[in-house]
């Protein structure tokens, strides 16, 4: 694993606060992940977000995994907002494809955020389907089950303080196949873009929406994944993340001409 967090202070250019990490696979007792609920790292090196017993997924399971280091997503002193990119691979597999539930999501949330609600279609992120600015959550959901607040198909959605997605695209979920995802956020345009590709058949899905992170999130957040299974015994699936990388870049302030060195921030992780 490669993990870095540093400040670059260069002559006549903006300084940048950068957080970057990469998990090509996961290991047991992964110290740099905060596991919540049913999440664990399997013996195969996969981040298993929901419970599997004797090879069978369990209903009413909720699990989350967050990176332990906070992400400085915007700076109150300058008003600047970070850009970020994250890529990951995951597999969702249901014993019965027509009864998949409920899905997996990547999210940004306050540092002290814990599992909310009853799981199921609320993803452990929300207490109800109603909007509330108090959540301070932005998420990208990969939804395998249609709930009352959803479009009438499996979909990828961008969620802002509500499980009711602000924008969606139909998702042709492939049962048991590896999906590769890239999510980017460009601070200059406030554009959040999601792309998902299945290498097995080269199908791709793209979704974009304007999201003002500064008006939604606190200055410091954690990033991670959450997943749930259904609230009845027949609606189940596995929700496994195979790999994950993330980089955020926050421009901080202009440097003086006399400073042309590169300085490390207060801590670094190797």
From Swiss-Prot:
The keyword Repressor is annotated on this UniProt entry: no
Binding residues for Mn(2+): 141, 143, 150, 155
Glycosylation sites: 60, 76, 127, 201
Domain of life of the organism encoding this protein: Eukaryota
Gene3D superfamilies per UniProt: 2.60.120.200
Binding residue positions for Ca(2+): 143, 145, 147, 150
The keyword Metal-binding is annotated on this UniProt entry: yes
GO terms of molecular function: carbohydrate binding; metal ion binding
InterPro entries: ConA-like_dom_sf, L-lectin, Lectin_LegA_CS, Lectin_legB_Mn/Ca_BS, Legume_lectin_dom, Leguminous_Lectin
Keyword terms, alphabetized: Calcium, Glycoprotein, Lectin, Manganese, Metal-binding, Signal
Pfam families: Lectin_legB
Leader sequence residues: 1-15
Function summary: GalNAc-specific lectin.
PANTHER family for this protein: CONCANAVALIN A-LIKE LECTIN FAMILY PROTEIN, LECTIN
Similarity field: Belongs to the leguminous lectin family.
Name assigned to this protein: Bark lectin
